[in-house]
């Protein structure tokens, strides 16, 4: 039997906590036997004293074990259970292509996703722009879809890592969100509860990233790879660029449209293609579905070329109560905005810099995201035809096409776009899409 205040005191004085002490505290968070004040105190001591790698692994596993951990053995699946997690960005629609692509190559992806947070779009919000799409199938249906289709994208239920919800809510109001051991545990507790064989982390870098500097993004990626492997799940991470909107669009319905066009081959933004492929390659190799980069890329290109990936996406949408002909007739089903009009720069020049975060916030301001949890989303609004870094813009080539609910909203968004995109006389040097791969 432990006392919460003694655990806090031990960490306050700079000592490492044992696995038993950490489990006692986390179970107390779940069972409401630990007070909010005690959670806040421990969070602050961890913020200042950090945690050793064994402590980080214990914290993550205790949070994972605070609720249901999915077990797939009874389904006798003939491939690995794999997933991807992104720290979030703008136009980051990779999940919608990656899940079907990897499933078409023999993987099983039980993807538990989130809603939009701050300036970043949420995969669930995007999928809910599809009429009827059910993000909360019951457990048996979820398992059926994974077995039959290979991929399902659903929302987090209260039974998964419940301690994290209470821990995070306290961190949010006590200035202890940006602690790497706490971020790592929060991300991984939910992902590892999926019962995965392998995981790839997409950690964003740049003006639209969750972490403010390259060094902090790198530290988070290294922490996640170390902890997840320590918890027994093969994990690699990619540091990918978020100094500009990743896709050509940003919003909800507009990104779903781009995902379908990507899968069918109608249109593939080259940067989005690079990042999606790189993440899929990691999943295939870690899941032992390919022996190396070349084999993985060949398999992935094949399922894009032969239509299998698009077919899997269509089957997932139908299985989750969306239209059965969505891939063929997406334009018929996705909501359209009242006003669609391009915004042009005031001068000619090359796009040299983009405040990606500000562009994400502009989508939120138009109604495409939530300022508070109770807000409803306008799925139709957003940006398409986004200019990329290095593009030459003038009276012919717009900065973006804005889809808005009315003229006022369009004007506000146009102002935000112009303020967020800087022009120069010369094109900037091109930046990589993937900066670094991190493995154990």
Swiss-Prot record:
This is Thymidine phosphorylase. Keywords: Glycosyltransferase, Transferase. SUPFAM superfamilies: Nucleoside phosphorylase/phosphoribosyltransferase catalytic domain, Nucleoside phosphorylase/phosphoribosyltransferase N-terminal domain, Pyrimidine nucleoside phosphorylase C-terminal domain. The enzymes which catalyze the reversible phosphorolysis of pyrimidine nucleosides are involved in the degradation of these compounds and in their utilization as carbon and energy sources, or in the rescue of pyrimidine bases for nucleotide synthesis. InterPro entries: Glycosyl_Trfase_fam3 (IPR000312), Glycosyl_Trfase_fam3_N_dom (IPR017459), Glycosyl_Trfase_fam3_N_dom_sf (IPR036320), Nuc_phospho_transferase (IPR035902), PYNP-like_C_sf (IPR036566), PYNP_C (IPR013102), Pyrmidine_PPas_bac/euk (IPR018090), Pyrmidine_PPase_CS (IPR017872). Its EC number is 2.4.2.4. Signal peptide: none annotated. GO terms for biological process: pyrimidine nucleobase metabolic process; thymidine metabolic process. Homodimer. GO terms for cellular component: cytosol. GO terms for molecular function: 1,4-alpha-oligoglucan phosphorylase activity; thymidine phosphorylase activity. Belongs to the thymidine/pyrimidine-nucleoside phosphorylase family. Pathway: Pyrimidine metabolism; dTMP biosynthesis via salvage pathway; dTMP from thymine: step 1/2. It comes from Shigella flexneri. The keyword Glycosyltransferase applies. It catalyses: thymidine + phosphate = 2-deoxy-alpha-D-ribose 1-phosphate + thymine.
């Amino acid at each position: 039997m432990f006392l919460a205040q003694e655990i806090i005191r031990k960490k306050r004085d700079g000592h490492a906590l044992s696995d038993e002490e950490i489990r006692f505290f986390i179970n107390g968070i779940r069972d409401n036997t630990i007070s909010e004040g005690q959670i806040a105190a421990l969070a602050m001591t961890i913020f200042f004293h950090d945690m050793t790698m064994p402590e980080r692994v214990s914290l993550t596993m205790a949070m994972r074990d605070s609720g249901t951990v999915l077990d797939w053995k009874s389904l006798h699946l003939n491939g690995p259970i794999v997933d991807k997690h992104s720290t979030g960005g703008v136009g980051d629609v990779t999940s919608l292509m990656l899940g079907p692509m990897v499933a078409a190559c023999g993987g099983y992806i039980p993807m538990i996703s989130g809603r939009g947070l701050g300036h970043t779009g949420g995969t669930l919000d995007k999928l809910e722009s599809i009429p009827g799409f059910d993000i909360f199938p019951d457990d048996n249906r979820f398992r059926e879809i994974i077995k039959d289709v290979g991929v399902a994208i659903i929302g987090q239920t209260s039974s998964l890592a419940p301690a994290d919800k209470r821990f995070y809510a306290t961190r949010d109001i006590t200035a202890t969100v940006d602690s790497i051991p706490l971020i790592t545990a929060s991300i991984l507790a939910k992902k590892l509860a999926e019962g995965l064989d392998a995981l790839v982390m997409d950690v964003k870098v740049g003006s639209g990233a969750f972490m403010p500097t390259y060094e902090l993004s790198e530290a988070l990626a290294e922490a996640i790879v170390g902890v997840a492997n320590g918890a027994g799940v093969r994990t690699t991470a990619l540091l990918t660029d978020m100094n500009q909107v990743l896709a050509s669009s940003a919003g909800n319905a507009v990104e779903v449209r781009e995902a379908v066009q990507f899968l069918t081959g109608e249109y593939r933004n080259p940067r989005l293609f690079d990042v999606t492929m790189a993440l899929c390659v990691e999943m295939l190799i870690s899941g032992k579905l390919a022996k190396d980069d070349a084999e993985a890329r060949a398999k992935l290109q094949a399922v894009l070329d032969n239509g299998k990936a698009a077919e899997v996406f269509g089957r997932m949408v139908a299985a989750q109560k969306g239209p059965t002909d969505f891939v063929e007739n997406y334009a018929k089903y996705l909501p359209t905005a009242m006003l669609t009009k391009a915004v042009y720069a005031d001068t000619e020049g090359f796009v040299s810099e983009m405040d990606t975060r500000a562009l994400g916030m502009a989508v939120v301001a138009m109604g495409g995201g939530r300022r508070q949890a109770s807000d409803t989303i306008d799925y139709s609004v957003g940006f398409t035809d986004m200019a990329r870094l290095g593009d030459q813009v003038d009276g012919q080539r717009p900065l973006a096409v804005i889809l808005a609910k009315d003229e006022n909203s369009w004007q506000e968004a146009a102002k935000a776009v112009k303020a967020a995109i800087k022009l120069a006389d010369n094109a900037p040097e091109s930046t990589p899409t993937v900066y670094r791969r991190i493995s154990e």
